[in-house]
UniProtKB/Swiss-Prot annotation:
It is an enzyme of class 2 (transferase). Carbamoyl phosphate binds at S52, T53, R54, T55, Q79, R103, H130, P131, C132, Q133, C258, L259, R286. Its main location: cytoplasm. Belongs to the aspartate/ornithine carbamoyltransferase superfamily. OTCase family. Pfam families: OTCace, OTCace_N. It comes from the Bacteria. One of its GO terms (cellular component) is cytoplasm. GO terms for molecular function: amino acid binding; ornithine carbamoyltransferase activity. Keywords: Amino-acid biosynthesis, Arginine biosynthesis, Cytoplasm, Transferase. The keyword Calcium does not apply. It catalyses: carbamoyl phosphate + L-ornithine = L-citrulline + phosphate + H(+). Reversibly catalyzes the transfer of the carbamoyl group from carbamoyl phosphate (CP) to the N(epsilon) atom of ornithine (ORN) to produce L-citrulline. It comes from Ruthia magnifica subsp. Calyptogena magnifica. This is Ornithine carbamoyltransferase.
Length: 299
């Protein structure tokens, strides 16, 4: 049976934990200068309809480090961007490569692609979730503070795809999640109902951050929402992660952001560049955790 990675909780906790464990080992191996060509002669197709820095660089570099090859396919490069049916593209592309990574707008389209693919599909970001980023976040927390189980995390800002994936992670990794959003910017109702036992909803960021172990945020306007930027700056002004907000968390608390960040909006400069911030380690770990994910999916 083909294994896909479309949502974080597609995989059992044991498998997610093993992927992170292997990622830490691969990172140590890479830092020591050891060469591992375990994916030699394997090809990863990377399909994008969104611009990307961390996703493209981490997957492409990761395949190279493991001896494989990564093929970049934007919607301008392939017939999928000119109206070829998703089913047809899935059948053809999967017949020529070993694994496919997709960073596209429609989560539904990723599912359709997976249903018609003969190789594993990785969701590298959709309008619904961002599971690869969460693997990196969980790895980063474990490296810095140990197990995240039974900890309390505060999500501050928009109830977007990253927030959805943190809700999935709360169940998979057994932590409590406080979600603070403006009134009309909560996560999708389906997610609220599905993960109700693992989350608490707030409209006050300071209350959500009380005594938490980790504070996480994301941009106020995601790609495709640029027209709402000015309105959202006003609506979200009380949901900026600054030093005053971080002071509500535990003294040992850390800060994460999937990047890119807008300093002075969702996070202040002194927080993202401060001693509690793990954003650079978090970004670097995308490389190693995705290498471990590729090895898992390719067995």
């Amino acid at each position: 049976m083909i294994k896909h990675f479309i949502n974080l909780d597609d995989l059992p906790n044991h498998d997610l934990t093993q992927i992170i464990k292997q990622a830490i080992a691969l990172k140590k191996q890479y830092k020591s200068g050891k060469i591992n060509k375990i994916l030699e002669h394997k090809t990863l197709a990377m399909i994008f309809d969104k611009s990307s820095t961390r996703t493209r660089v981490s997957f492409e570099a990761g395949m190279t480090q493991l001896g494989g090859h990564a093929l970049f396919l934007s919607d301008k490069d392939i017939q999928l961007g000119r109206g070829e049916p998703i089913i047809d593209s899935a059948i053809v592309i999967s017949s020529m490569v070993d694994v496919i990574m997709m960073r596209i707008s429609s989560h539904k389209d990723i599912h359709t692609f997976a249903e018609n693919s003969s190789v594993p599909i990785i969701n590298a970001l959709s309008d619904e979730s961002h599971p690869c980023q969460l693997l990196s976040d969980m790895m980063t927390y474990q490296e810095h503070n140990g197990s995240i189980a039974n900890k309390t995390i505060a999500w501050i800002g928009d109830g977007n795809n990253m927030c959805h994936t943190y809700m999935q992670a709360a169940k998979s990794f057994n932590f409590k999640l406080n979600i603070a959003t403006p009134k009309n910017y909560q996560p999708d109702q389906d997610f609220i109902e599905k993960y109700a036992n693992h989350i608490h909803l707030f409209t006050d960021a300071q209350k959500a951050c009380q005594k938490v172990d980790l504070v996480v945020t994301d941009v106020w306007a995601s790609m495709g929402q640029e027209a709402e930027q000015t309105k959202r700056k006003i609506t979200f002004k009380d949901f900026s992660v600054n030093a005053a907000l971080m002071s509500k968390a535990k003294p040992s608390a850390v800060f994460m952001h999937c990047l890119p960040a807008h300093r002075g909006e969702e996070v202040s400069t002194n927080v993202i560049d401060g001693s509690q911030s793990l954003v650079w380690l978090e970004a670097e770990n995308r490389l190693h955790v995705q290498k471990a994910l590729l090895l898992y999916l390719l067995n």
